[in-house]
């Protein structure tokens, strides 16, 4: 008679934003199946918040330059793509950036509405030269997985959409090793060296 054992899950915090799970025992062959399924689900199906686009007066596409800003719009968008945010509600929000040069504009200078927090405040957004100014609106939204810039378009011709990566999970890895519990079975060690970017806990 086949006797199935109920797997046990143990969790261990390995440091800031790092977690390890051990699931054992599993029937032979189940470790790879379960591990790959969990990995794909964590990387693609965990909801999060991301930048969907920006609005700067006088700028209507990404292949242009902004007077007084060292980076072009494309580089600025790539920098904002790495912005990590915590949002208390499920609403879309607009953040503002008002800065004057010379010097770097950091994510800490982004003005957020109540319930929105920038996690990586040391992120460099752009560099202003001389006494130039930057007045920019940054739109953020909730979502799952990856969204192309075309899906973030609005009716506003001055709005520049950006590809959005909503997943707060940065990396997932797993290993399967044999364990002895009466007979040879699988043990799934699911570990993520850098699983979260800080927007969830």
Which ranges hold each PLM region?
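Protein-protein interaction/assembly regions in multi-subunit complexes
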Residues: 1-192, 199-201
């Amino acid at each position: 008679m086949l006797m199935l054992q109920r797997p046990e899950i143990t969790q261990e915090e390995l440091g800031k934003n790092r977690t390890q799970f051990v699931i054992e025992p599993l029937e032979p062959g189940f470790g790879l199946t379960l591990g790959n399924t969990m990995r794909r689900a964590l990387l693609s199906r965990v909801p999060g918040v991301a930048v969907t686009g920006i609005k700067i007066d006088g700028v209507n596409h990404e292949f242009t330059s902004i007077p007084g800003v060292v980076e072009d719009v494309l580089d600025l968008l790539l920098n904002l793509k790495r912005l990590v945010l915590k949002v208390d509600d499920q609403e879309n929000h607009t953040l503002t950036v008002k800065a004057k040069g010379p010097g770097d504009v950091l994510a800490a200078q982004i003005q957020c509405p109540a319930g929105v927090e920038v996690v990586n405040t040391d992120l460099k957004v752009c560099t202003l030269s001389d006494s130039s100014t930057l007045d920019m609106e940054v739109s953020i939204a909730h979502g799952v997985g990856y969204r192309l810039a075309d899906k973030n378009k609005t009716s506003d011709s001055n709005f520049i959409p950006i590809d959005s990566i909503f997943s707060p999970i940065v990396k997932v890895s797993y290993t399967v090793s044999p364990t002895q519990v009466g007979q040879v079975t699988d043990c799934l060690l699911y570990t993520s060296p850098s699983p979260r970017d800080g927007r969830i806990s």
